[in-house]
């Protein structure tokens, strides 16, 4: 009996993964998995970090975000080693996740049947998650690093993704039609490789990819990603920020940014030594920093109301 349970347990777990609505997560599951998010949500339960926070996130560096997450014990939210489209741009948005596995005919058939007949999905599985995208989403795909015969995204779907979201993708696999994708304005994307082939999705013939998860927890390289995470892609790396920590990441980054600007200016003026700026600031330097904030409040790359909030919290 024990041996049988070991055999059937993975099957039972996989069946439960498909859930009552096929491979798409239910609202109840998503609420259960994101209890620390207290803000607005999409109708399906996905956390909806505000547009204002997303706007401010564009100036956050990977180092700043990494430090905040590390201090909160989130140690597996970053991955690197990407090829990029628009490498000098920053990708920010709310994650919508898709998980593919190497194609398996029996699973593929029942997912196709349920998707087409009961969920009214159209065409092949590689477009199903894309049909759900909205503005400021980022399509995050675990394509298990598939290379030859692996690409599920080319310039046709790329145009659809960009039209729906205004963003590019994070794609753990190969893309195709790279020239066409580069022609899409602001399609800032991170992907593993390029190959001119395309995925194969015929369960009665050539098949190499099957979609088993929509908006479920997924793995991208060394990172764990949840739907609704804030995606921050820049400088060759991608950070996946839990929604309940997004505001803290932004505010911490803004404080660091302002202190760096002040410190660099004072060093150029030779008012303080590098040792004074690099160590814990004295009360005199902190007072000077507050005065500098007030003096330049309309010219700094941080919202004025955020600087005012910072000044109110200071005691010097």
What does each model-identified segment do?
Residues 1-9:
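Bacterial N-terminal signal peptides that target proteins for export
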Residues 45, 161, 229-231:
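Buried hydrophobic positions in well-ordered alpha/beta secondary-structure cores of metabolic enzymes
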């Amino acid at each position: 009996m024990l041996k049988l349970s070991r055999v059937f347990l993975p099957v039972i777990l996989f069946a439960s993964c498909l859930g009552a609505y096929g491979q798409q997560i239910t609202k109840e599951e998503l609420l259960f998995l994101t209890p620390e998010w207290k803000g607005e949500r999409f109708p399906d339960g996905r956390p909806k970090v505000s547009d204002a926070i997303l706007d401010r996130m564009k100036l956050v560096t990977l180092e700043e975000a990494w430090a905040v997450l590390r201090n909160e014990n989130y140690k597996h939210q970053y991955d690197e080693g990407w090829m990029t489209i628009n490498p000098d741009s920053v990708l920010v948005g709310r994650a919508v996740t898709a998980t593919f596995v190497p194609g398996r005919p029996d699973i593929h058939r029942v997912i196709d049947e349920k998707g087409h007949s009961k969920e009214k999905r159209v065409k092949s599985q590689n477009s199903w998650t894309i049909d759900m995208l909205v503005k400021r989403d980022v399509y995050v795909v675990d394509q298990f690093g598939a290379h030859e015969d692996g690409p599920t995204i080319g310039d046709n779907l790329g145009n659809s993704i960009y039209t729906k979201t205004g963003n590019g993708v994070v794609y753990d696999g190969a893309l195709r039609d790279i020239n066409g994708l580069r022609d899409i304005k602001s399609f800032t994307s991170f992907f593993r490789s390029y190959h001119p082939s395309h995925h194969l999705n015929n369960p009665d013939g050539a098949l190499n990819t099957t979609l088993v998860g929509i908006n479920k927890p997924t793995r991208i390289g060394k990172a764990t990603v949840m739907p609704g995470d804030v995606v921050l892609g820049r400088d060759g790396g991608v950070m996946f920020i839990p929604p309940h920590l997004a505001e803290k990441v932004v505010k911490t980054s803004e404080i660091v940014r302002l202190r760096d600007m002040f410190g660099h200016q004072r060093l150029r003026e030779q008012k303080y030594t590098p040792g004074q700026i690099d160590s814990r600031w004295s009360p005199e330097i902190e007072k000077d920093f507050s005065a500098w904030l007030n003096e330049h409040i309309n010219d700094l790359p941080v919202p004025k109301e955020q600087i005012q909030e910072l000044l109110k919290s200071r005691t010097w």
